Amino acid sequence: MPSIDLHTHSTKSDGTLTPAQLVEMARELGLAALALTDHDSVDGIAEAEEAAERFFMESPAEDPAGCSPEPASGYGTELVPGVEVSTEYKGRSVHIVGLFPDWRNPRFRESLRRFSDAREERNRKMCELLRGKGVDIYYEDLCRAFPGNIITRTHFARYMLQKGYVSRTWEAFQTYIGDDRPCFVPRIKISSTDAVRFLLRFHAFPVLAHPIQYYSAFYDLEELLADLKAAGLQGIECYYGSHTMYDFQTISRYASEYGLLPSGGSDFHGANKPGLRMGVGYGHMSIPARVLTDIKHAHYHTGDSTRIFFCDFDGTLARTDKSVSPYSREVLDRWTAAGHRFVFSSGRIMADIKVQIRRLGLHLPGMLLSACNGAEIYDCDSGVTLYKRTLNRDQIRKIQAIADSVGLFCLTHSDSRFYVPREGPETEFYFRTVRIPYNVCEDLAEAVDELPCKIHTVSLEDPDKLAIFRRLIGEAFGDELNVYRTHPCYVEVVPGGVSKGHALQWLCRRLGIRPENSLAAGDSENDLSMLQAAATGILMRNGAEMNPYLKDGADLVTEYDNDQDGLARTLASILDRIDA
Protein backbone atom coordinates (compact mmCIF):
# COMPACT_ATOMS: atom_id res chain seq x y z
CA MET A 1 0.00 0.00 0.00
CA PRO A 2 1.62 3.31 -1.05
CA SER A 3 2.08 6.00 1.60
CA ILE A 4 2.00 9.80 1.45
CA ASP A 5 3.27 12.89 3.28
CA LEU A 6 1.02 15.96 3.35
CA HIS A 7 3.15 18.34 5.45
CA THR A 8 6.68 19.35 4.35
CA HIS A 9 8.78 22.51 4.05
CA SER A 10 11.36 23.69 1.51
CA THR A 11 13.94 26.45 1.26
CA LYS A 12 11.08 28.79 0.35
CA SER A 13 10.33 28.91 4.09
CA ASP A 14 12.43 27.16 6.75
CA GLY A 15 13.43 23.86 5.16
CA THR A 16 16.88 23.03 3.83
CA LEU A 17 15.92 21.25 0.58
CA THR A 18 14.68 23.03 -2.52
CA PRO A 19 11.16 22.22 -3.72
CA ALA A 20 12.57 20.08 -6.54
CA GLN A 21 14.84 18.23 -4.11
CA LEU A 22 11.85 17.45 -1.89
CA VAL A 23 10.02 15.90 -4.83
CA GLU A 24 13.11 13.92 -5.80
CA MET A 25 13.44 12.60 -2.24
CA ALA A 26 9.76 11.65 -2.13
CA ARG A 27 10.17 9.80 -5.42
CA GLU A 28 13.22 7.92 -4.13
CA LEU A 29 11.28 6.95 -0.99
CA GLY A 30 8.41 5.66 -3.11
CA LEU A 31 5.84 8.10 -1.71
CA ALA A 32 2.66 8.27 -3.77
CA ALA A 33 2.05 11.92 -2.89
CA LEU A 34 3.82 14.86 -1.28
CA ALA A 35 2.32 18.16 -0.15
CA LEU A 36 4.55 21.23 -0.11
CA THR A 37 3.24 23.39 2.74
CA ASP A 38 5.71 26.22 3.26
CA HIS A 39 4.98 28.84 5.91
CA ASP A 40 2.80 31.64 4.49
CA SER A 41 4.23 31.04 1.02
CA VAL A 42 3.38 29.24 -2.22
CA ASP A 43 6.53 30.45 -3.99
CA GLY A 44 7.94 26.93 -4.27
CA ILE A 45 4.93 25.21 -5.78
CA ALA A 46 5.74 25.94 -9.42
CA GLU A 47 9.22 24.43 -9.06
CA ALA A 48 7.86 21.40 -7.20
CA GLU A 49 5.10 20.88 -9.76
CA GLU A 50 7.62 21.02 -12.60
CA ALA A 51 9.71 18.32 -10.93
CA ALA A 52 6.68 16.14 -10.18
CA GLU A 53 5.41 16.61 -13.73
CA ARG A 54 8.70 15.40 -15.13
CA PHE A 55 8.48 12.18 -13.13
CA PHE A 56 4.77 11.80 -13.98
CA MET A 57 5.53 11.89 -17.70
CA GLU A 58 8.41 9.41 -17.30
CA SER A 59 6.17 6.87 -15.54
CA PRO A 60 4.36 4.09 -17.41
CA ALA A 61 0.65 4.77 -17.89
CA GLU A 62 -0.11 1.05 -17.89
CA ASP A 63 1.06 0.54 -14.29
CA PRO A 64 -1.66 -1.54 -12.60
CA ALA A 65 -1.51 0.67 -9.52
CA GLY A 66 -3.26 3.28 -11.62
CA CYS A 67 -6.45 1.24 -11.39
CA SER A 68 -6.86 1.96 -7.69
CA PRO A 69 -8.58 5.08 -6.36
CA GLU A 70 -5.42 5.93 -4.46
CA PRO A 71 -2.71 8.06 -6.11
CA ALA A 72 -0.95 5.71 -8.48
CA SER A 73 2.70 4.98 -7.73
CA GLY A 74 3.00 4.11 -11.41
CA TYR A 75 2.53 7.79 -12.22
CA GLY A 76 5.34 8.96 -9.93
CA THR A 77 4.96 11.10 -6.82
CA GLU A 78 1.96 13.42 -6.97
CA LEU A 79 2.60 17.00 -5.87
CA VAL A 80 -0.20 18.39 -3.72
CA PRO A 81 -0.04 22.20 -3.59
CA GLY A 82 -0.36 23.58 -0.08
CA VAL A 83 0.51 26.27 2.43
CA GLU A 84 0.83 26.47 6.22
CA VAL A 85 -0.66 29.68 7.62
CA SER A 86 0.61 30.97 10.97
CA THR A 87 -2.34 32.11 13.09
CA GLU A 88 -3.27 33.15 16.61
CA TYR A 89 -5.95 31.69 18.88
CA LYS A 90 -6.46 33.25 22.32
CA GLY A 91 -2.87 34.39 22.52
CA ARG A 92 -1.33 31.11 21.35
CA SER A 93 0.21 30.17 18.02
CA VAL A 94 -1.86 27.77 15.88
CA HIS A 95 -1.01 26.60 12.36
CA ILE A 96 -3.58 25.87 9.66
CA VAL A 97 -2.55 23.90 6.56
CA GLY A 98 -4.43 24.57 3.33
CA LEU A 99 -4.32 21.82 0.70
CA PHE A 100 -5.15 22.49 -2.98
CA PRO A 101 -5.43 26.31 -2.70
CA ASP A 102 -5.85 28.51 -5.77
CA TRP A 103 -2.13 29.21 -5.53
CA ARG A 104 -1.84 30.95 -8.90
CA ASN A 105 -4.41 33.58 -7.87
CA PRO A 106 -2.68 36.99 -7.50
CA ARG A 107 -5.02 38.02 -4.66
CA PHE A 108 -4.17 34.87 -2.71
CA ARG A 109 -0.45 35.43 -3.18
CA GLU A 110 -0.76 39.10 -2.20
CA SER A 111 -2.54 38.14 1.03
CA LEU A 112 0.25 35.72 1.87
CA ARG A 113 2.79 38.46 1.16
CA ARG A 114 1.05 40.67 3.71
CA PHE A 115 1.39 37.87 6.26
CA SER A 116 5.11 37.71 5.40
CA ASP A 117 5.45 41.48 5.78
CA ALA A 118 4.27 41.14 9.37
CA ARG A 119 6.94 38.47 9.83
CA GLU A 120 9.60 40.83 8.42
CA GLU A 121 8.59 43.58 10.86
CA ARG A 122 8.90 41.09 13.73
CA ASN A 123 12.29 39.89 12.48
CA ARG A 124 13.70 43.42 12.33
CA LYS A 125 12.64 44.02 15.94
CA MET A 126 14.25 40.74 17.01
CA CYS A 127 17.50 41.75 15.30
CA GLU A 128 17.43 45.01 17.24
CA LEU A 129 16.94 43.18 20.55
CA LEU A 130 19.72 40.70 19.73
CA ARG A 131 22.13 43.54 18.98
CA GLY A 132 21.31 44.85 22.43
CA LYS A 133 22.52 41.49 23.78
CA GLY A 134 25.79 41.70 21.87
CA VAL A 135 24.80 39.69 18.78
CA ASP A 136 25.84 41.58 15.64
CA ILE A 137 22.90 40.72 13.39
CA TYR A 138 20.81 42.67 10.88
CA TYR A 139 17.79 41.54 8.90
CA GLU A 140 19.68 42.14 5.66
CA ASP A 141 22.40 39.73 6.88
CA LEU A 142 19.78 37.00 7.28
CA CYS A 143 18.37 37.64 3.80
CA ARG A 144 21.85 37.39 2.26
CA ALA A 145 22.64 34.23 4.22
CA PHE A 146 19.36 32.55 3.24
CA PRO A 147 18.37 33.96 -0.17
CA GLY A 148 14.83 33.28 -1.30
CA ASN A 149 13.76 32.03 2.13
CA ILE A 150 11.00 33.32 4.38
CA ILE A 151 13.05 34.16 7.47
CA THR A 152 11.95 32.32 10.62
CA ARG A 153 13.47 31.86 14.06
CA THR A 154 15.19 28.73 12.73
CA HIS A 155 17.20 30.96 10.38
CA PHE A 156 18.15 33.21 13.31
CA ALA A 157 19.46 30.15 15.17
CA ARG A 158 21.40 28.84 12.15
CA TYR A 159 22.97 32.27 11.55
CA MET A 160 24.01 32.59 15.20
CA LEU A 161 25.53 29.11 15.03
CA GLN A 162 27.47 30.01 11.87
CA LYS A 163 28.82 33.18 13.51
CA GLY A 164 29.80 31.41 16.74
CA TYR A 165 27.33 33.07 19.11
CA VAL A 166 25.93 29.66 20.10
CA SER A 167 27.32 26.12 19.92
CA ARG A 168 23.97 24.46 19.14
CA THR A 169 20.86 25.79 17.40
CA TRP A 170 18.72 24.88 20.41
CA GLU A 171 20.93 27.13 22.52
CA ALA A 172 19.79 30.13 20.47
CA PHE A 173 16.19 29.35 21.35
CA GLN A 174 16.93 28.59 24.99
CA THR A 175 18.98 31.73 25.54
CA TYR A 176 17.66 34.35 23.12
CA ILE A 177 14.71 33.71 20.80
CA GLY A 178 12.50 31.00 22.29
CA ASP A 179 9.04 31.89 23.57
CA ASP A 180 9.35 34.20 26.60
CA ARG A 181 13.10 34.64 26.02
CA PRO A 182 14.49 38.21 26.08
CA CYS A 183 14.80 38.64 22.28
CA PHE A 184 11.53 36.99 21.27
CA VAL A 185 8.96 39.23 19.60
CA PRO A 186 5.45 37.86 18.96
CA ARG A 187 4.18 38.41 15.44
CA ILE A 188 0.82 39.95 14.66
CA LYS A 189 -1.06 37.09 13.05
CA ILE A 190 -4.39 36.41 11.45
CA SER A 191 -6.83 34.69 13.80
CA SER A 192 -7.22 30.94 13.39
CA THR A 193 -10.89 31.21 12.44
CA ASP A 194 -10.19 33.97 9.91
CA ALA A 195 -7.39 31.85 8.44
CA VAL A 196 -9.81 28.97 7.87
CA ARG A 197 -12.25 31.33 6.15
CA PHE A 198 -9.40 32.83 4.11
CA LEU A 199 -8.32 29.41 2.87
CA LEU A 200 -11.89 28.44 2.01
CA ARG A 201 -12.32 31.67 0.06
CA PHE A 202 -9.43 30.57 -2.15
CA HIS A 203 -10.79 27.03 -2.52
CA ALA A 204 -8.33 25.29 -0.20
CA PHE A 205 -9.05 22.33 2.07
CA PRO A 206 -8.22 23.66 5.58
CA VAL A 207 -6.55 21.29 8.06
CA LEU A 208 -5.54 21.88 11.69
CA ALA A 209 -1.79 21.17 11.85
CA HIS A 210 -0.08 19.18 14.66
CA PRO A 211 -3.06 19.43 17.08
CA ILE A 212 -1.33 17.40 19.77
CA GLN A 213 0.86 20.43 20.41
CA TYR A 214 -2.18 22.44 21.42
CA TYR A 215 -3.57 19.54 23.46
CA SER A 216 -0.37 19.19 25.46
CA ALA A 217 -0.26 22.94 26.02
CA PHE A 218 -3.20 22.52 28.42
CA TYR A 219 -5.68 24.84 26.82
CA ASP A 220 -8.94 23.56 25.59
CA LEU A 221 -8.40 21.71 22.31
CA GLU A 222 -12.11 20.97 22.14
CA GLU A 223 -12.96 24.67 22.28
CA LEU A 224 -10.43 25.33 19.51
CA LEU A 225 -11.90 22.55 17.39
CA ALA A 226 -15.45 23.76 17.93
CA ASP A 227 -14.54 27.30 16.86
CA LEU A 228 -12.54 26.15 13.84
CA LYS A 229 -15.23 23.69 12.77
CA ALA A 230 -17.80 26.49 12.91
CA ALA A 231 -15.50 28.55 10.66
CA GLY A 232 -15.31 25.70 8.13
CA LEU A 233 -12.35 23.52 9.18
CA GLN A 234 -12.43 20.27 7.18
CA GLY A 235 -9.45 18.22 8.30
CA ILE A 236 -7.09 17.52 11.18
CA GLU A 237 -3.62 16.01 11.30
CA CYS A 238 -4.22 12.65 12.94
CA TYR A 239 -0.86 11.58 11.56
CA TYR A 240 2.19 13.61 12.57
CA GLY A 241 5.93 13.05 12.62
CA SER A 242 6.22 12.93 16.42
CA HIS A 243 2.88 11.24 17.24
CA THR A 244 2.76 8.16 19.41
CA MET A 245 0.02 5.59 18.89
CA TYR A 246 -1.82 7.17 21.82
CA ASP A 247 -1.58 10.59 20.13
CA PHE A 248 -2.92 9.13 16.88
CA GLN A 249 -5.85 7.47 18.65
CA THR A 250 -6.64 10.63 20.63
CA ILE A 251 -6.70 12.92 17.61
CA SER A 252 -8.56 10.33 15.53
CA ARG A 253 -11.26 10.33 18.19
CA TYR A 254 -11.53 14.11 17.92
CA ALA A 255 -11.66 13.84 14.12
CA SER A 256 -14.61 11.49 14.36
CA GLU A 257 -16.37 13.59 16.99
CA TYR A 258 -16.08 16.84 15.01
CA GLY A 259 -16.63 15.39 11.54
CA LEU A 260 -13.11 16.16 10.31
CA LEU A 261 -11.20 14.13 7.75
CA PRO A 262 -7.82 12.71 8.82
CA SER A 263 -4.72 14.25 7.26
CA GLY A 264 -1.13 14.51 8.29
CA GLY A 265 2.53 14.53 7.47
CA SER A 266 6.04 14.45 8.83
CA ASP A 267 6.54 18.24 9.03
CA PHE A 268 9.85 17.53 7.32
CA HIS A 269 12.31 20.46 7.33
CA GLY A 270 15.48 18.70 6.20
CA ALA A 271 18.54 19.39 8.35
CA ASN A 272 16.62 21.94 10.42
CA LYS A 273 14.86 19.06 12.23
CA PRO A 274 17.58 16.43 12.76
CA GLY A 275 16.31 12.87 12.97
CA LEU A 276 12.93 13.65 11.42
CA ARG A 277 12.52 11.81 8.12
CA MET A 278 10.14 12.45 5.24
CA GLY A 279 7.25 10.01 5.17
CA VAL A 280 7.93 8.45 8.58
CA GLY A 281 8.69 11.32 10.97
CA TYR A 282 10.68 10.40 14.07
CA GLY A 283 9.43 6.83 14.12
CA HIS A 284 7.32 4.62 11.95
CA MET A 285 4.56 6.95 10.76
CA SER A 286 2.87 5.67 7.62
CA ILE A 287 -0.02 7.58 6.07
CA PRO A 288 -2.09 5.42 3.70
CA ALA A 289 -2.81 6.93 0.29
CA ARG A 290 -6.51 6.47 0.95
CA VAL A 291 -6.30 9.47 3.31
CA LEU A 292 -5.57 11.74 0.34
CA THR A 293 -8.23 10.06 -1.80
CA ASP A 294 -10.87 10.80 0.85
CA ILE A 295 -9.74 14.44 1.00
CA LYS A 296 -10.00 14.69 -2.79
CA HIS A 297 -13.48 13.17 -2.80
CA ALA A 298 -14.66 15.68 -0.20
CA HIS A 299 -12.91 18.63 -1.84
CA TYR A 300 -13.89 17.92 -5.44
CA HIS A 301 -17.26 16.23 -4.77
CA THR A 302 -16.27 12.93 -6.36
CA GLY A 303 -16.29 9.32 -5.19
CA ASP A 304 -15.18 5.80 -6.01
CA SER A 305 -18.13 5.36 -8.38
CA THR A 306 -17.77 8.74 -10.12
CA ARG A 307 -17.17 8.52 -13.86
CA ILE A 308 -15.49 11.15 -15.99
CA PHE A 309 -16.05 11.87 -19.69
CA PHE A 310 -13.46 13.77 -21.75
CA CYS A 311 -15.12 15.09 -24.89
CA ASP A 312 -13.57 16.81 -27.89
CA PHE A 313 -15.58 19.70 -29.34
CA ASP A 314 -14.96 20.27 -33.07
CA GLY A 315 -16.07 17.23 -35.05
CA THR A 316 -17.24 15.38 -31.95
CA LEU A 317 -19.70 17.19 -29.68
CA ALA A 318 -20.22 20.01 -32.19
CA ARG A 319 -22.00 19.64 -35.48
CA THR A 320 -20.41 21.05 -38.63
CA ASP A 321 -22.08 24.43 -38.00
CA LYS A 322 -20.50 24.48 -34.47
CA SER A 323 -23.86 23.99 -32.74
CA VAL A 324 -24.72 21.34 -30.15
CA SER A 325 -27.96 19.47 -30.75
CA PRO A 326 -30.81 19.42 -28.21
CA TYR A 327 -30.42 15.65 -27.91
CA SER A 328 -26.70 15.99 -27.09
CA ARG A 329 -27.58 18.50 -24.35
CA GLU A 330 -30.21 16.12 -22.98
CA VAL A 331 -27.73 13.24 -22.75
CA LEU A 332 -25.04 15.44 -21.15
CA ASP A 333 -27.59 16.65 -18.59
CA ARG A 334 -28.39 13.03 -17.82
CA TRP A 335 -24.66 12.28 -17.43
CA THR A 336 -23.99 15.08 -14.93
CA ALA A 337 -27.31 14.54 -13.10
CA ALA A 338 -26.02 11.05 -12.26
CA GLY A 339 -23.07 12.69 -10.46
CA HIS A 340 -20.50 12.11 -13.20
CA ARG A 341 -18.02 14.72 -14.45
CA PHE A 342 -17.80 16.21 -17.93
CA VAL A 343 -14.57 17.63 -19.40
CA PHE A 344 -14.75 19.87 -22.48
CA SER A 345 -11.44 18.85 -24.08
CA SER A 346 -10.21 20.90 -27.03
CA GLY A 347 -7.15 22.10 -28.88
CA ARG A 348 -8.59 25.63 -28.66
CA ILE A 349 -7.12 28.12 -26.20
CA MET A 350 -8.93 28.56 -22.88
CA ALA A 351 -10.31 32.01 -23.73
CA ASP A 352 -11.87 30.64 -26.92
CA ILE A 353 -13.38 27.65 -25.10
CA LYS A 354 -15.01 30.00 -22.60
CA VAL A 355 -16.44 32.02 -25.51
CA GLN A 356 -17.87 28.83 -27.01
CA ILE A 357 -19.35 27.78 -23.66
CA ARG A 358 -21.11 31.13 -23.29
CA ARG A 359 -22.28 31.08 -26.91
CA LEU A 360 -23.75 27.61 -26.51
CA GLY A 361 -25.13 28.20 -23.03
CA LEU A 362 -23.42 24.97 -22.04
CA HIS A 363 -23.24 25.20 -18.26
CA LEU A 364 -23.06 21.76 -16.66
CA PRO A 365 -22.52 21.14 -12.93
CA GLY A 366 -18.98 20.09 -12.15
CA MET A 367 -17.79 20.82 -15.70
CA LEU A 368 -14.07 21.19 -16.40
CA LEU A 369 -12.29 22.66 -19.41
CA SER A 370 -9.12 21.22 -20.95
CA ALA A 371 -7.52 23.63 -23.43
CA CYS A 372 -4.58 23.62 -25.84
CA ASN A 373 -4.54 19.82 -26.13
CA GLY A 374 -4.27 19.40 -22.37
CA ALA A 375 -1.83 22.21 -21.56
CA GLU A 376 -4.36 24.01 -19.33
CA ILE A 377 -7.18 22.66 -17.13
CA TYR A 378 -9.85 24.88 -15.56
CA ASP A 379 -12.56 24.10 -12.99
CA CYS A 380 -15.73 25.98 -13.99
CA ASP A 381 -17.41 25.71 -10.58
CA SER A 382 -14.53 27.19 -8.57
CA GLY A 383 -12.92 29.31 -11.28
CA VAL A 384 -9.56 27.75 -10.44
CA THR A 385 -6.86 26.88 -12.97
CA LEU A 386 -5.85 23.41 -11.84
CA TYR A 387 -3.02 22.86 -14.30
CA LYS A 388 -1.04 24.93 -16.79
CA ARG A 389 2.05 24.39 -18.93
CA THR A 390 3.49 27.13 -21.12
CA LEU A 391 6.15 27.71 -23.74
CA ASN A 392 9.04 30.02 -22.89
CA ARG A 393 10.11 33.02 -24.97
CA ASP A 394 13.18 31.31 -26.36
CA GLN A 395 11.04 28.43 -27.62
CA ILE A 396 8.54 30.85 -29.16
CA ARG A 397 11.30 32.71 -30.98
CA LYS A 398 12.84 29.51 -32.38
CA ILE A 399 9.47 28.08 -33.43
CA GLN A 400 8.59 31.29 -35.29
CA ALA A 401 11.96 31.25 -37.04
CA ILE A 402 11.39 27.67 -38.23
CA ALA A 403 7.88 28.56 -39.42
CA ASP A 404 9.28 31.57 -41.31
CA SER A 405 11.95 29.40 -42.93
CA VAL A 406 9.27 27.08 -44.31
CA GLY A 407 7.01 29.94 -45.34
CA LEU A 408 4.30 29.18 -42.78
CA PHE A 409 1.99 31.62 -41.05
CA CYS A 410 2.06 31.22 -37.26
CA LEU A 411 0.21 32.76 -34.35
CA THR A 412 0.21 32.49 -30.59
CA HIS A 413 -1.84 33.78 -27.67
CA SER A 414 -2.07 35.18 -24.16
CA ASP A 415 -4.92 34.54 -21.74
CA SER A 416 -7.22 36.97 -23.55
CA ARG A 417 -6.01 37.53 -27.13
CA PHE A 418 -4.04 36.19 -30.09
CA TYR A 419 -0.86 37.59 -31.64
CA VAL A 420 -0.23 37.33 -35.40
CA PRO A 421 2.77 38.53 -37.48
CA ARG A 422 0.54 40.02 -40.20
CA GLU A 423 -2.99 40.04 -41.52
CA GLY A 424 -3.93 38.06 -44.61
CA PRO A 425 -5.95 35.10 -45.85
CA GLU A 426 -4.74 33.01 -42.89
CA THR A 427 -6.22 35.39 -40.31
CA GLU A 428 -9.44 35.60 -42.30
CA PHE A 429 -9.65 31.80 -42.42
CA TYR A 430 -8.64 31.13 -38.80
CA PHE A 431 -10.76 33.79 -37.14
CA ARG A 432 -13.93 32.93 -39.04
CA THR A 433 -14.91 30.67 -36.10
CA VAL A 434 -12.61 32.00 -33.36
CA ARG A 435 -14.13 35.05 -31.65
CA ILE A 436 -11.02 36.30 -29.86
CA PRO A 437 -9.30 39.63 -30.66
CA TYR A 438 -5.76 39.67 -32.02
CA ASN A 439 -2.79 42.03 -32.18
CA VAL A 440 -0.45 42.30 -35.16
CA CYS A 441 3.25 42.14 -34.25
CA GLU A 442 6.35 40.83 -36.00
CA ASP A 443 8.11 39.35 -32.96
CA LEU A 444 5.65 37.05 -31.18
CA ALA A 445 8.04 36.26 -28.32
CA GLU A 446 8.38 39.93 -27.38
CA ALA A 447 4.72 40.78 -27.92
CA VAL A 448 3.03 38.28 -25.60
CA ASP A 449 2.27 39.71 -22.17
CA GLU A 450 1.63 36.21 -20.75
CA LEU A 451 3.43 33.06 -21.83
CA PRO A 452 1.26 30.92 -24.15
CA CYS A 453 0.38 27.25 -23.95
CA LYS A 454 0.83 26.74 -27.70
CA ILE A 455 1.84 28.11 -31.10
CA HIS A 456 -0.38 27.52 -34.12
CA THR A 457 0.84 27.26 -37.72
CA VAL A 458 -1.45 27.58 -40.74
CA SER A 459 -0.99 26.58 -44.38
CA LEU A 460 -3.94 27.16 -46.71
CA GLU A 461 -2.33 26.34 -50.06
CA ASP A 462 0.46 23.83 -49.40
CA PRO A 463 -0.22 21.33 -46.58
CA ASP A 464 3.13 19.65 -47.33
CA LYS A 465 4.80 22.61 -45.62
CA LEU A 466 3.19 21.49 -42.36
CA ALA A 467 4.89 18.10 -42.62
CA ILE A 468 8.24 19.80 -43.24
CA PHE A 469 7.68 22.14 -40.30
CA ARG A 470 6.78 19.22 -38.06
CA ARG A 471 9.98 17.39 -39.00
CA LEU A 472 12.13 20.47 -38.38
CA ILE A 473 10.56 21.05 -34.96
CA GLY A 474 11.30 17.45 -34.04
CA GLU A 475 14.91 17.79 -35.14
CA ALA A 476 15.38 21.08 -33.28
CA PHE A 477 13.60 20.27 -30.02
CA GLY A 478 13.19 16.50 -29.66
CA ASP A 479 10.97 15.64 -26.67
CA GLU A 480 11.05 19.24 -25.48
CA LEU A 481 7.94 19.98 -27.58
CA ASN A 482 4.93 18.05 -28.83
CA VAL A 483 3.43 18.70 -32.28
CA TYR A 484 -0.14 17.85 -33.34
CA ARG A 485 -2.02 17.98 -36.64
CA THR A 486 -5.45 19.25 -35.52
CA HIS A 487 -6.86 20.20 -38.94
CA PRO A 488 -5.83 19.62 -42.56
CA CYS A 489 -4.49 23.20 -42.54
CA TYR A 490 -3.18 23.41 -38.95
CA VAL A 491 -0.26 22.14 -36.89
CA GLU A 492 0.01 23.07 -33.20
CA VAL A 493 3.09 23.09 -30.97
CA VAL A 494 2.78 22.61 -27.19
CA PRO A 495 5.25 21.88 -24.34
CA GLY A 496 6.74 18.39 -24.26
CA GLY A 497 4.63 15.77 -22.54
CA VAL A 498 1.42 17.74 -23.06
CA SER A 499 -1.42 15.78 -24.63
CA LYS A 500 -5.11 15.19 -24.14
CA GLY A 501 -4.23 11.72 -22.84
CA HIS A 502 -1.86 13.16 -20.25
CA ALA A 503 -4.59 15.59 -19.16
CA LEU A 504 -6.98 12.67 -18.67
CA GLN A 505 -4.51 10.76 -16.50
CA TRP A 506 -3.56 13.88 -14.51
CA LEU A 507 -7.15 14.95 -13.87
CA CYS A 508 -8.31 11.48 -12.84
CA ARG A 509 -5.58 11.47 -10.22
CA ARG A 510 -6.23 15.03 -9.03
CA LEU A 511 -9.97 14.40 -8.60
CA GLY A 512 -9.54 10.95 -7.05
CA ILE A 513 -11.42 9.25 -9.90
CA ARG A 514 -10.57 5.66 -10.82
CA PRO A 515 -8.96 5.52 -14.28
CA GLU A 516 -11.20 2.58 -15.18
CA ASN A 517 -14.15 4.98 -14.80
CA SER A 518 -12.89 7.25 -17.60
CA LEU A 519 -14.36 7.73 -21.08
CA ALA A 520 -13.13 9.86 -23.97
CA ALA A 521 -14.50 10.79 -27.38
CA GLY A 522 -12.76 12.43 -30.33
CA ASP A 523 -12.29 12.50 -34.08
CA SER A 524 -8.75 13.67 -34.86
CA GLU A 525 -5.04 13.00 -34.42
CA ASN A 526 -4.76 15.14 -31.31
CA ASP A 527 -7.50 13.03 -29.67
CA LEU A 528 -5.65 9.74 -30.11
CA SER A 529 -3.71 9.84 -26.82
CA MET A 530 -6.97 10.59 -24.99
CA LEU A 531 -8.77 7.66 -26.63
CA GLN A 532 -5.89 5.37 -25.69
CA ALA A 533 -5.64 6.62 -22.10
CA ALA A 534 -9.36 6.30 -21.35
CA ALA A 535 -10.88 3.03 -20.19
CA THR A 536 -13.39 3.52 -23.02
CA GLY A 537 -12.18 5.40 -26.09
CA ILE A 538 -14.94 6.48 -28.50
CA LEU A 539 -13.96 7.42 -32.05
CA MET A 540 -16.44 9.39 -34.12
CA ARG A 541 -17.52 7.83 -37.40
CA ASN A 542 -16.49 10.98 -39.27
CA GLY A 543 -13.04 10.72 -37.68
CA ALA A 544 -12.69 7.08 -38.66
CA GLU A 545 -13.60 7.89 -42.24
CA MET A 546 -11.06 10.71 -42.49
CA ASN A 547 -8.28 9.03 -40.45
CA PRO A 548 -8.79 5.24 -40.50
CA TYR A 549 -5.63 4.63 -38.44
CA LEU A 550 -7.35 6.17 -35.40
CA LYS A 551 -9.53 3.06 -35.11
CA ASP A 552 -6.54 1.14 -33.72
CA GLY A 553 -6.49 3.44 -30.68
CA ALA A 554 -10.23 3.37 -29.94
CA ASP A 555 -12.47 0.84 -28.20
CA LEU A 556 -15.47 1.59 -30.38
CA VAL A 557 -16.58 3.71 -33.33
CA THR A 558 -19.91 5.55 -33.30
CA GLU A 559 -22.53 4.30 -35.74
CA TYR A 560 -23.39 7.88 -36.75
CA ASP A 561 -21.29 10.99 -37.39
CA ASN A 562 -21.23 14.30 -35.53
CA ASP A 563 -24.08 15.76 -37.59
CA GLN A 564 -26.31 12.80 -36.70
CA ASP A 565 -25.91 12.80 -32.90
CA GLY A 566 -23.39 9.98 -33.16
CA LEU A 567 -21.79 10.83 -29.81
CA ALA A 568 -25.05 11.40 -27.93
CA ARG A 569 -26.50 8.08 -29.12
CA THR A 570 -23.39 6.22 -27.98
CA LEU A 571 -23.19 7.97 -24.60
CA ALA A 572 -26.90 7.33 -23.98
CA SER A 573 -26.32 3.63 -24.63
CA ILE A 574 -23.42 3.62 -22.15
CA LEU A 575 -25.59 5.33 -19.53
CA ASP A 576 -28.30 2.72 -20.08
CA ARG A 577 -25.76 -0.02 -19.30
CA ILE A 578 -24.53 1.83 -16.20
CA ASP A 579 -28.08 2.25 -14.93
CA ALA A 580 -29.07 -1.35 -15.67
Sequence positions of predicted segments:
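An N-terminally biased module of ancient metal coordination in phosphate/nucleic-acid-related enzymes
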Residues: M1-R92, I177-G178, I190-F198, F202-E257, ...
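Extreme N-terminal starter segment of soluble prokaryotic enzymes
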Residues: M1-I4, S305-F310
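Active-site phosphate-binding/coordination module
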Residues: E47-E50, V80, E84-D117, P326-T427
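Catalytic core of soluble alpha/beta enzymes
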Residues: S266-H299
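Mg2+-dependent phosphoryl-transfer enzymes with acidic/Ser/Thr/Gly-rich catalytic loops
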Residues: T302-I308, S325, E492-A580
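Conserved acidic, metal-coordinating active-site core of Asp-based
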Residues: G148-P211, I402-A521, E525-L528, A533
